[in-house]
């Protein structure tokens, strides 16, 4: 087994799993789908590409875990958007968007495919598309990646986010 460790820190993060329409919630820690989305962005996988399903399937097969380094604070943002057509306002949309403020997480991605983990590490250091921690308004602070071949899972308890 090989493990790639990712440190997620930012002023704001949002990890939605069931948000719809007017209320955009966030989970209290990163979701696997959110992390896979960020990795797919780094790798340059386009949703409508022919091989996108195969690439995403490979990413989904990886094992995933999160350690909370700093919980952060749940905050709510009142958000209003106005739609304008032909120089006239036609509608206003009001939503509540929830974020985690100043949270820090250590995310572990485990796979038997060491080449895939190396490819992900390289892509996260030089992403094809911008990286976000859940939403576009949540860019990470200098994402740190570390690749650990044959990393025993019990050692994860001793790894600090600062390493």
State the predicted function of each range.
Residues 7-9, 65-67, 108-110:
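Residue-level recognition of well-ordered beta-strand positions that form the cores
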Residues 4, 62-64, 103-105:
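Generic beta-strand structural signal
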Residues 1, 7, 50-52, 64, ...:
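Residue-level detector of functional hotspots within protein domains
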Residues 69-163:
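Internal, well-folded beta-alpha domain core
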């Amino acid at each position: 087994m090989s493990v790639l460790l990712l440190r997620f820190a930012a002023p704001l993060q949002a990890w939605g799993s069931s948000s719809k329409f007017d209320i955009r919630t966030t989970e209290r820690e990163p979701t696997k789908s959110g992390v896979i989305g960020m990795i797919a962005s780094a790798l340059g996988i386009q949703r409508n590409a022919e091989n996108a399903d195969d690439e995403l399937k490979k990413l989904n097969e990886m094992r995933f875990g999160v350690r909370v380094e700093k919980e952060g604070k749940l905050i709510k943002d009142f958000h209003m958007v106005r739609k304008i057509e032909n120089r006239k306002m036609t509608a206003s949309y009001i939503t509540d968007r929830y974020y985690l403020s100043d949270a820090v997480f250590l995310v572990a991605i485990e796979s038997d495919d060491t080449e895939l983990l190396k490819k992900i590490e390289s892509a996260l250091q030089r992403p094809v598309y911008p990286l976000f921690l859940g939403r576009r308004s949540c860019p990470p602070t200098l994402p740190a990646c570390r690749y650990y071949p044959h990393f025993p899972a019990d050692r994860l308890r001793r790894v600090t986010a600062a390493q």
